[in-house]
């Protein structure tokens, strides 16, 4: 009977374990002219998911993801995205844009978050 108790304990621990997190890095760095003219943005983006199959979908649709992000970045005003509030707004908009795109292309959206790991406006 003690063996059964150990099996139950292991099963409970496995159920309580947080899902494995994976990241998809949009490569190479994104560089786009800003709508405000004369300025550009350079940034690196990481997409977080807890679904390994969805990670493969992100890889498959990498060019479409990159294109959508470049279009979104080129619509931005440099003054707005220099503030932390502006960056957070852009992050949320980018997450929504990529989530909608993945829903359209793969039939699901398993994105958990989007992170800017480099962010430069000049």
Would you name each region that the model predicts?
Residues 1-122:
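Flexible, low-complexity charged segments
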């Amino acid at each position: 009977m003690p063996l059964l108790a150990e099996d139950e304990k292991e099963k409970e621990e496995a159920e309580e374990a947080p899902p494995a997190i994976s990241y998809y890095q949009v490569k190479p760095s994104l560089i786009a002219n800003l709508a405000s003219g004369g300025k550009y943005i350079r940034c690196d983006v990481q997409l977080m998911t807890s679904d390994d199959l969805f990670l493969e979908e992100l890889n498959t649709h990498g060019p479409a993801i990159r294109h959508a992000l470049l279009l979104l970045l080129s619509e931005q005003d440099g003054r707005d995205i220099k503030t932390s509030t502006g960056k957070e707004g852009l992050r949320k908009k980018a997450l929504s844009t990529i989530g909608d795109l993945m829903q359209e292309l793969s039939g699901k959206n398993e994105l958990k978050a989007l992170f800017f790991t480099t962010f430069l406006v000049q």
